[in-house]
Amino acid sequence: MVQACEGRSRAQLPTLSLGADMTQPPPAKAPAKKHVRLQERRGSSVALMLDVRSLGTVEPICSVNTPREVTLHFLRTAGHPLTRWTLQHQPPSPKQLEEEFLKIPSNFVNPEDLDIPGHASKDRYKTILPNPQSRVCLGRAHSQEDSDYINANYIRGYDGKEKVYIATQGPMPNTVADFWEMVWQEDVSLIVMLTQLREGKEKCVHYWPTEEEAYGPFQIRIQGMKEHPEYTVRHLTIQHQQECRSVKHILFSAWPDHQTPESAGPLLRLVAEVETPETAANSGPIVVHCSAGIGRTGCFIATRIGCQQLKARGEVDILGIVCQLRLDRGGMIQTAEQYQFLHHTLALYAAQLPPETDP
């Protein structure tokens, strides 16, 4: 190979035309090379012996981590605890928070890895898919011949408790019955909705009745409604066959898509609305959704977990919270602006807590 390349290089050099009265001197002879044995070149008199039979049997010096392994390692180990005092008086700068946020792997699902026929027709956004290891599988309470698929994931809560939340997309016309089946199957007593039905374009269909309506085999009734400045609370009943259950539905409308609320107060009041004895007594997960089920949904869940950490420990690990959320559902917390707003909201909550007592 080397000789062939050298041959091409010489062939490409321009030739020099010599005059008739000039004679070309004979080429100088290159000095003879002294052949050196391999042992001498290596500076050793010990013969080099290579047993080709041993090739391939030696363990590699180090293993190479795949991008997937690197992602999982980061999401499982990263953290940045902040005390109440630091969060209020010496918080990271917006630039530092942006840099920290951009280092967090999104952990989105590759569509090729989701081997579920026909799932695309039930996805509001083709690139936002449920992570397989934590996705909710429908048990098919009705006789409809369909898959167990719904674009939803179980999400861990404070202290890593399993299945505290279900994060899901805003229901579509062809997934409303699936949504209510999930509510029934998981014994859900609280739904938090963080989007309006339309924000320029459709973000979510009107999946609850004005008074009473059937969605598949589930009969939904409105029992009462109360409007607050930033959100509306509806008390529903869901009936399947002869069994009837109560469900609380909260529609928080003061949050534009891909942005943040004008102030943190309304979000903290929403969290307080959720912190009721009824919520604590119910064993089922809280269903949280916006349009895609990752941005505003992630912010609400992270805020509630962060408030619980501050109240119980006197510090909060917002980076660790977001990493835990993204392990369960890729892309939770969509923008650096939302990440910064999360810090601002939790700093406000920390300021509202009773003064810390000296140990």
From Swiss-Prot:
Residue numbers of Phosphothreonine PTMs: 66
InterPro entries: Prot-tyrosine_phosphatase-like, PTP_cat, Tyr_Pase_AS, Tyr_Pase_cat, Tyr_Pase_dom, Tyr_Pase_KIM-con
Keyword Cytoplasm: yes
Modified residues (Phosphoserine): 44, 93, 143
Modification after translation, per record: Oxidized at active site cysteine. Treatment with pervanadate (vanadate and H(2)O(2)) or with antigen enhanced oxidation of active site cysteine.
Gene Ontology terms: biological process: signal transduction
Highest taxon listed in the record's lineage: Eukaryota
Residue ranges of domain Tyrosine-protein phosphatase in the record: 97-349
Family annotation (CDD domains): PTPc-N7
Recorded family membership: Belongs to the protein-tyrosine phosphatase family. Non-receptor class subfamily.
Protein name: Tyrosine-protein phosphatase non-receptor type 7
Highest classification ranks of the organism: Eukaryota, Metazoa, Chordata, Craniata, Vertebrata
